[in-house]
Amino acid sequence: MTQNIDTSEVEKFADLAERWWDPKGEFKPLHIINPLRAEFIASRVDLKNMDVLDVGCGGGLLCEALFDFNGKISGIDAAGPGIEIAKRHAKDNCKEILYRDITAEELVDSESEKYDVVTCLEVIEHVPDPQSLVTACSNLLKPGGSLFLSTINRNPRSWITAIVGAEYIFNILPKGTHEFSKFIKPSELASCMRTAGINLSETKGMFYNPLTHKANLNNDLGVNYLMYGKKPKN
């Protein structure tokens, strides 16, 4: 089986697993941007009866939001405790979602199932090999399928905003959540998508205000951004 995980990253999120669904806890920013992310995806693809896979699903925030758009949702993550939280929360809320403790690369190696939509949001900056992850996501897509990615740009502004501001000044993220060297420029992520056989359709910036705790999509790719691409039909 192919491994593309940073053990320290997995342990970091495993330790926080019990707090995934606390809207005022360490994952508060994700709770705030989650509806925005789900609506962005659902506005580009009609999810009704679509087979959707969320890679790096954590405690299941995005999976449950996409379930509400009538998709057939699966989630995978390498941090086992988070998967258990996701399973429990989905069951408690009567949402039929399939969760597995496995990486995208391992899933490619272990089964032939393909998906109409693959999402991988706020995950790429936590793995050693971004290209391997994007390629695995592409390999899990059906021909004509849609891929949604999001991450953080790498520049002085993103260091000030996403690390200094978010982790040390406003304390909206636990210290050590991000490593600047793992941030990815949009041009680099677009190159990863092309190498993986994905045609880039759209890129949007995402702004989170740490004072008002409001978020919106825009055309500023300076810090957080999303990419949407399609796999050719043949």
Give the residues covered by each predicted segment:
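Conserved SAM-binding loop
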Residues: 38-45, 50-159, 186, 227-229
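Short, flexible, mixed-charge acidic loops at enzyme active sites
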Residues: 158-168
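Conserved S-adenosyl-L-methionine
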Residues: 198-209
